[in-house]
Amino acid sequence: MVAGELAIEVLIAGVAGGMLCAATGGLPALSLAGIVITAGEIANVTGGTTTVGDSTGAEVFDVAAAPLTAFGVSGAVGFGPILGPHVAFAGGVAAAAYLGRRETIDTGFRYHQAKQITKPLGSRPEVLAVGGGFGLFGVLVARVSADVGFPVDPVMLAVVVSGFAHRLAFGYPLVGRVRDLPTSVLDMSPFERDERWGEPDNETSQGTGGRHVVEPWLPAHYDWLQVGVLGVGIGVASGYVALVTGSVFLAFGITAASLLFLVLGLYDVPVTHHMALPASIAALAMVPEFEPTWLILVAAGVFGALGALAGEAAQRTLYAHADTHLDPPAVSIVLTSLLIAVLAALGVLDPGPVPYPEL
């Protein structure tokens, strides 16, 4: 099915989803999607419905609500045109980029205001319109990606494309201020030394005055070793959840739901859904090949670490020097999904559990 054949109901729902989550904020929207995905996967695992209406899987209005092979509520809502990250989260992030260029969203926020994605943005028509427009854009990008057969996660690819698109649309640098850096783009030590642009008394300015030279995505979690070890732990745990439930998406849903703690101000809680998803897929895709089972968990830990390190590399190159939120976990999932698709094509992984187009 090509993008031009998308049911009008799905397109309208995409606009509504983007508007809704521009009002609530991008990160609250993603945590809500995680809650819905978790509930949907539990229903699937325990024998709940795996159909929506008269359609099989996630097909609604003659179109797959989720390009991923998710079922029931997970696919139709959690990955669909209302709460799917490519719609809701991306719409909320774009709305923050729009509003953050014009005014202060949060006087206590240390970075550029356009990176403030945890706060509700209200109900002003222009803000909702931006969210709705990028929600629609996310539906179209994900659908085109799935139809063309790109061997990556179409939902997260749409999140990444949307992030670059809102930077272009609202006049932000595409990758940030990387030419004037005294050190490598990967170097976060200027943050540790509290180095700033301009005068130090304008931390919430929409310009550069007073801002950190580099702005780590998660100030409590950017050390390579710490991030990698965390990825191993999350990967093993997610692999175990996948093995005992048979669900590719349950661990992803749980870890995405945990973003609610960040929304509530517990900023030391790590972001881990980009570690959980590749680990879960790898665990299920290795089942026919690996014995004993503990080796599967080891492999899941490796994929969790890869997801973690890819996310850290993404934040250092595409977030820390920029003015808006371009989601490091989404970039990570795009990269790890491509790796998984390649390994499936080479016969290293069983392509059956892999929820992406085959190479």
Where are the predicted features?
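Alpha-helical multipass membrane-protein architecture
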Residues: 2-359
